[in-house]
């Protein structure tokens, strides 16, 4: 598959083994996993970090192998668990990380205004932000009147 802003192919990576059910040796129930996710979120970990901790420390390969107890036709995800318990971030995490990158790059460009490579990088990051904002508005994760503003983004990112 090609990269978004380059005309070349991406690097190949390792693939997860195809599984449809949790491994037999896994002793955790859905309730145990929900409690672990909520506990880790309250400790301040991001969803990506929670998944890594569950994999490395608890031996849970992926949460998606389990079924959502509220809707058995849906896979369980860390984000759904956090939404259910009211711990989901108001701005989706991938969007927040891109906004944080854009803010840091703007700060760099204030000190180095002639850095044209970074200027181009900022344009690409902000294009990704606008594309994600459009998607999240359509899905209802962001309000319809939400806009990306670089000055307001500084306040969003601590």
UniProtKB/Swiss-Prot annotation:
Protein family per UniProt: Belongs to the universal ribosomal protein uS15 family.
Region feature (Disordered): 1-21
Subunit structure, interactors included: Part of the 30S ribosomal subunit.
Single GO MF descriptor: small ribosomal subunit rRNA binding
Organism: Pyrococcus horikoshii (strain ATCC 700860 / DSM 12428 / JCM 9974 / NBRC 100139 / OT-3)
Pfam families for this protein: Ribosomal_S13_N, Ribosomal_S15
Cellular component aspect of the GO annotation: cytosolic small ribosomal subunit
Protein name: Small ribosomal subunit protein uS15
Name of the coding gene: rps15
Lyase listed as a keyword: no
